[in-house]
Amino acid sequence: MVITLLNLNKKHYLLILFFILLNGCSIDKNIILNKKQKQHKIFNLPITHTSKETHNFNYQDNKQSNNNYLEPLFEDYKPRNVGDILTIILQENTSASNSVSNNSIHNGNSNFDIDIGNARAFDDPNGILNKIELNSSIKNNFLGKGSSSANNTFVGLITVIVDRILPNGNLEVSGSKNITINDGIEKICFYGIVNPHTISKNNSVLSTKVANTNITYISSGPINIGSKINWLQRLFVSLFTLSK
């Protein structure tokens, strides 16, 4: 065997090396089946997401799941199956402003003349009643202005799960995160449609590149309660608004 290897030239060595590398790009069928069974055990639980439907991750019954679980040696990992995870980089920054101005001026004048005729019949030698003139004028000015502005910034990270694979290959993802700090609870929910081509090599995607995005942020605790006005203050605010 040693003599045979020594008699091989460089071309034969390159050919052997090529087949070794080619073997590294393939996986045994038994490994694939074992991987499917492990994933089936992990994800065969009903999980509630932010979407309206509750999905049961059963790979054997889900016809929309891609059965290709091969992970090539020279390819970056990207989610391509139901149950795969994906990191969403939240970078939402919205700004809106509105300004309204209305200026209305209305002027009106009216003249009304009455010619009585012979002033002597009314015992008016000076002719005061000879002609009576009535004048009236109306002037109405209205000036109104209004403006509003809003700025919202949302930055963070959340990891979501692929719920469904659309016919065109896009991924429907959703996920939630609960954070408890002292007595305060913060919950972030995310839902959207991800194009696999926008996923980076580190398995993340910007929230600005996700379609049909639905981001919900809910906070509860002493700080949230303290920021709300009580019923008595709301009553005074309502009365003050009606008095205007």
Curated annotation (Swiss-Prot):
InterPro entries: Flag_Lring (IPR000527). A lipid is attached at C25 (S-diacylglycerol cysteine). The keyword Cell membrane applies. It comes from the Bacteria. Its main location: membrane. Belongs to the FlgH family. This is Flagellar L-ring protein. It comes from Buchnera aphidicola subsp. Baizongia pistaciae (strain Bp).
